[in-house]
Amino acid sequence: MRYPVSTGIAAPAWFAFFCAWAGLWTFSLPVQAERIKDLASIQGIRPNQLIGYGLVVGLDGTGDQTVQTPFTIQSLNNMLMQLGINVPPGTNMRLRNVAAVMVTAALPPLAQPGQAIDVTVSSMGNARSLRGGTLLMTPLKGIDGQVYGVAQGNLLVGGIGAAASGSKVQVNHLNAGRIPGGATVERAVPVALGQNDMIRLELNTIDFSTAKRIVDAVNTRFGMGTAAALDGRAIQVRTPPESDQRVAFLAEMESLAINPAQMPARVIVNSRTGSVVMNQAATVDQCAIAHGNLTVVISTEPVISQPGPFSSGRTVQAQRSTIEIKQESGMLTMVEGASLAEVVKALNAIGATPQDLLAILQAMKSAGALRAELEII
């Protein structure tokens, strides 16, 4: 829609007015303000997982080895029978361009029949690659066994590979791919948007302070008694009875901006990869850390035992092992950090690797020096 613009205002004056208006709008919200829609969701408005079993055809000799995957042949025979093609019993089909796959998708909330959704296709046999394949019509079922969608289309595989003369080169993964918009929704999931003119907001992260601030913001905008906190995660909100008014109410409510409470201090440690992530609330009390590495090196080298001249002995080969223990000098470091940057800087100063940080952080938590919740995933 085009709005008429008066030509009596010069361009610089109009631009200055727009900048001033934008500045007032920018400073009307706190710097860390977030919308309610980014902090909470409406109960019942959620996706549903779908799954299906199907066949991918058109592969360039990279499909399942049907001798080792009998379910692929069984699925193919069943499909051909449904199409009116009968394969003689006992026929040994050695196909290399067919692969059995699992198809998964997420049914979006409030999805309607006819809507297209993305699907992920993953090989479940011994196919070497799904690149260039086409997924045949596959029903997608929910947890209740009902069909909610049908998938079919050409696969988009991000990987690439080549092999010749015993050499093989592969980039990324070849046994899984996606079909953007490859499934059509056939059935909608019934959603009851609240009961008795009441809906429930569920915070993404439990926090009593944030729940109280959301309640205060909603009651300030729509009147006292509109919202009430049930606990640190759930908030009950009264909505208009008519559906069109309810949609307008929810649209305005979820756009309200509030200042969420500061997240609790937390340190996340991935024990498999050695990754350590800390938020800004993580602090460290004054403590001493002794950091040193103990290295054990065992080396084995062959030794030739040569018999003496004019003797009846034989030359033999023996093994001689050397064991050496090295211990780097530990450094007693005083650490006291008030923020995330200082904590990381202090730990890096003693030469700690990510794997060393796992042990250091656990010891600091046990000693009471780490003022944060330590979570190992």
Swiss-Prot record:
Primary site of residence: periplasm
Record keyword Cell wall biogenesis/degradation present: no
Record's keyword terms, sorted: Bacterial flagellum, Periplasm, Signal
A Pfam family: FlgI
MF (Gene Ontology): structural molecule activity
GO biological process: bacterial-type flagellum-dependent cell motility
Domain of life: Bacteria
Segment forming the signal sequence: 1-33
InterPro entries for this protein: Flag_FlgI
Gene Ontology CC annotations of this record: bacterial-type flagellum basal body, distal rod, P ring; outer membrane-bounded periplasmic space
Cell location: Periplasm; Bacterial flagellum basal body
Family label: Belongs to the FlgI family.
Function: Assembles around the rod to form the L-ring and probably protects the motor/basal body from shearing forces during rotation.
Subunit structure: The basal body constitutes a major portion of the flagellar organelle and consists of four rings (L,P,S, and M) mounted on a central rod.
Listed name of the protein: Flagellar P-ring protein
Organism for this UniProt entry: Nitrosospira multiformis (strain ATCC 25196 / NCIMB 11849 / C 71)
UniProt lineage: Bacteria, Pseudomonadati, Pseudomonadota, Betaproteobacteria, Nitrosomonadales
